[in-house]
Amino acid sequence: MERIKVIEYISNLGDGGAETLVKDYVRLLDRNLFDPVVVVLRGGESSANKRTIEENKIPIIEIFHRWNIWVRVWKKLCGWWYIPYRLKRIIRSENAKVMHMHLMILKDVPHVGKDLDSMRLLFTCHSVPSKVFEGERIKEKIAAQKLIRNNQLQLIALHDDMATELNEMFGVQNTVVIRNGIDFNRFRDVSTTKEEKRKELSIPQNAFVVGHIGRFTDEKNHTYLVDVFAEIAKKRKDAFLLMVGAGDTSVTEQRLLEYGLANRYQILSHRSDVNEILRAMDVFVFPSKYEGLPLSLVEAQVASLRCIASDAVSIEAFCTENAVRLPLSSAEAWANVVLDTAIKGNPHANLDEYDMNREIKRLERLYLGEG
């Protein structure tokens, strides 16, 4: 049986949740059935996810090989024809039968034209649908509507509430839920000890380590995270903030300096050892302003960390009593909950539902057209 060529099409290969999911998809798909290739709109990334994909000898095709001011100008002026042209060439040269799309890359896809007619198209919504398809991103919604109408685009949600919202937004009833899956063994069977990882990262052995994983963007709310940590630091002189994520860290670091916490934090990026880094933490704090379903929060629960997260996060991400859900109130109130280990959460989902091996089988059935 000839293997089915699958394109995973995403805007870039950073170290965010969507990019991590794509990395896991192409790594874990049954290679007897599928032949995956990753297509990225913006190349030039240097990330742990990209390295892992390359190590697994999975091709990466870049529409734009670098991303600088000149390329951005070119994209703005000519992207409307160049991107569909490149996609069309890639689909033909790879003889692709399935294209699974992620993040904000839909608007140019309908212009590929007839080459889409014989393909199975899927799109995973990785954030709150209103943030993905409305306001300045209305072109994404228009493109999705065209692809649903003309090419039977299959919408994929990360949880049940998101599926309901997508069904209502696009007037469909068939949105499928495929959760952000995790390789449980990777986060449970970690040979590195807390002491070893702290030594490697130059974190004091006796520190109370407050951890966070997420790219440095507004929705992750790092400013509030620093405010919470500053309140924790008032009460615990051994408090240390460990953040993992790519992006512009200048605002976050300036705020830490203003609080006099210059020697009480560390920022890591492009890491492939997140499972070990979680071992170095005592508590995981996740105060997002809005979210789809954050992979890092579920990973922290699989690693048996106590987690404090905002109620902007889907309720289905709270799977154990170690995960406490809070409104974004005062930083002091959050600090008090972080420090009071007697406060427990109410599980709203089964952690086993996030087993990647289970979710990948569901995805494979979609790729095969078996619903």
Name each model-derived stretch.
Residues 3, 8-16, 20-78, 162-169, ...:
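N-terminal strand-loop element at the rim of the active site
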Residues 17, 343-371:
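A charged, aromatic-enriched C-terminal amphipathic alpha-helix characteristic of glycosyltransferases
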Residues 19-24, 208, 212-231, 250:
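A conserved mid-protein helix/loop that constitutes part of the nucleotide-sugar donor-binding site
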Residues 101-107, 125:
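Short His-centered aromatic/hydrophobic patch
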Residues 149-187:
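A short, active-site helix/loop in glycosyltransferases that binds the activated sugar's phosphate group
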Residues 270, 289:
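Aromatic "clamp/platform" in nucleotide-sugar-dependent glycosyltransferases that forms part
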Residues 306-310:
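Short hydrophobic beta-strand element within catalytic cores of glycosyltransferases
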